[in-house]
């Protein structure tokens, strides 16, 4: 397949796509597509050859990050929803799917990450949860089962 065509196809994706390479305990970004740049506000040349932990901006106390770490330690695929932060500091909820890429000797070479902004979906779920809790409290207050 023509590599130029492949790059154009990946850059045309509406979801952020990254390729990372393991380097010690880090997974270093070696490629990000245009959608990743739009999603995060970072240009590729600002963030390549860094671990993508910078997207958490110190917000590392997330169960999903622990789940992701376990998957990475076992060279497995994973899908998690994590809090990330754009270059301007604004929060977004990131549905991250990662998949390992192995060579012909079954050795881990890279991880492919696909990132999708699910902030609106999470906000809707939080509003629904709040409404359900308010309804439960009203029922409790008035003795309605």
What are these regions (language model features)?
Residues 58-90:
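Terminal output helix/cap of sensory domains in signal transduction proteins
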Residues 48-59:
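PAS-family sensory/regulatory domains
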Residues 96-98, 115:
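Sensory-domain boundary capping and coupling elements
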Residues 122-140:
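Sensory-domain boundary/capping and coupling elements
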Residues 22-23, 83-88, 102, 107-120, 127:
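PAS-family sensory domains
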Residues 1-25, 29-34, 140-145:
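Sensory modules in modular signal-transduction proteins
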Residues 36-47:
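PAS/PAS-like sensory domain cap-loop motif
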């Amino acid at each position: 397949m023509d590599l130029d065509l492949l790059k154009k196809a990946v850059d045309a994706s509406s979801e952020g796509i990254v390729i990372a390479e393991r380097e010690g305990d880090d997974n270093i970004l070696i490629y990000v597509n245009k959608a990743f740049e739009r999603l995060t506000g970072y240009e590729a040349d600002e963030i390549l050859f860094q671990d993508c932990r910078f997207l958490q901006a110190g917000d590392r106390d997330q169960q999903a990050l622990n789940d992701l770490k376990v998957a990475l330690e076992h060279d497995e695929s994973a899908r998690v929803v994590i809090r990330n932060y754009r270059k301007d500091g604004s929060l977004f909820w990131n549905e991250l799917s990662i998949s390992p890429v192995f060579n012909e000797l079954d050795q881990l070479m890279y991880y492919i990450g696909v990132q999708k902004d699910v902030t609106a979906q999470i906000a809707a779920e939080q509003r629904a949860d709040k409404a359900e809790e308010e309804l439960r409290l009203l029922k409790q207050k008035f003795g309605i089962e």
